């Protein structure tokens, strides 16, 4: 367990454009009943022109405002995304510039829908170093960029949005934007913050979720007799996502509960001491299956699928922020955050809000 961290603030952002299930009947053969009964999704938010970085900035500002720290106090920015606006510069550097967080070093990660879990774990490990005091994590996704809207099984699943958290080293004195100081790891709460993480991957199943076409070598010095570059995966859908739905379902319903069990086993904390599980929002049937396998009531598994759909790595921090602002998740509660996604990747982390 790691005691030296604290979630200071959460934030989220969803675009204004809301697309109800009924709209999809205009472009593919489907209807609201077919979509909602199979996914639990009734609507989703889609960008009407906002870039991935723009949504990330808005979520980040909300998290920073809640944290009560100045952007200049942020030491590290980690962005998780599978839909960056540029190969370079990375999204974290763009967000740093927009926030004025000039003292932060920055990088992006891509672990698909598990990205926020991995970013959180990286952040906690950096907080153990003397150079890092405050970390901003931003998960921001424009999945509409990669969605084939002629594929009725895929296009109804995804939404756009961003979520963010500010995490601080709880063993150090946190300085707020107003200049007030507070010891976030005083003697009365030295045991308040617990942490454990379990992350895994199965690269042999990478074909189950593939996005963006393979780009072969194309420089002018390729010899005429050179072998042709071959993609690792067969992908004939341009830059759009392709997904093997049944294979992903089997993976998710097996590995997400497994990751949760492993993280609880490592921490020594039993399931009945966990207040809520905040899972990646992919499909209501997956969440129901995971709850059943874990033997927990459905209400312990947080779900906001109905009005946001699958927002990839942004889904967990969006749900976390919504629950915090609604007052359902409160200080001192024990949470398990868990996800699975392309790679294939999976993971869970135990934390205290």
Task: Report the location of each language-model feature.
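Conserved beta-ketoacyl condensing-enzyme motif
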Residues: 7-9, 50-110, 263-287
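Conserved catalytic cysteine-centered active-site region
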Residues: 34-38, 42-54, 82-135, 291-319
């Amino acid at each position: 367990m790691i005691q030296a961290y604290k979630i200071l603030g959460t934030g989220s952002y969803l675009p204004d454009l809301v697309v109800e299930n009924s709209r999809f009947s205009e472009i593919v053969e489907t209807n609201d009943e077919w979509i909602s009964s199979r996914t639990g999704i009734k609507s989703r938010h889609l960008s009407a022109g906002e870039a991935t970085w723009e949504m990330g900035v808005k979520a980040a500002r909300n998290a920073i405002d809640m944290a009560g720290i100045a952007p200049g106090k942020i030491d590290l920015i980690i962005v998780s995304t599978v839909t960056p606006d540029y190969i370079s510069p990375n999204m974290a550097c763009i967000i740093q510039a927009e926030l004025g967080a000039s003292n932060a070093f920055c990088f992006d990660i891509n672990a698909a829908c598990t990205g926020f879990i991995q970013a959180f774990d990286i952040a906690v490990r950096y907080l153990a170093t003397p150079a890092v005091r405050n970390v901003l994590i931003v998960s921001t996704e424009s999945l509409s960029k990669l969605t084939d809207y002629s594929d009725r099984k895929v296009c109804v699943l995804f939404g756009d949005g961003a979520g963010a958290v500010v995490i601080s080293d709880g063993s150090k004195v946190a300085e707020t934007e107003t200049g007030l100081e507070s010891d976030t790891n005083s003697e009365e709460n030295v045991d308040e913050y617990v942490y454990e993480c379990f992350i895994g991957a199965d690269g042999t199943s990478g074909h189950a979720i593939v996005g963006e076409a393979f780009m072969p070598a194309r420089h002018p010095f390729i010899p005429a007799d050179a072998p042709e570059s071959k993609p690792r995966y067969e992908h004939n859908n341009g830059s759009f996502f392709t997904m093997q739905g049944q294979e992903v379902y089997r993976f998710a319903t097996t590995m997400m509960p497994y990751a949760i069990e492993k993280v609880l086993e490592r921490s020594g904390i039993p399931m009945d001491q966990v207040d809520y599980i905040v899972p990646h929002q992919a499909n209501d049937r997956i969440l129901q299956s995971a709850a059943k396998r874990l033997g927990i009531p459905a209400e312990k598994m947080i779900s906001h699928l109905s009005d946001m759909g699958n927002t990839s790595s942004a889904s967990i921090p969006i749900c976390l922020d919504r629950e915090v602002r609604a007052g359902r998740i409160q200080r001192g509660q024990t949470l398990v955050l868990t996800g699975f996604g392309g790679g294939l990747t999976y993971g869970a982390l135990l934390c205290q809000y």
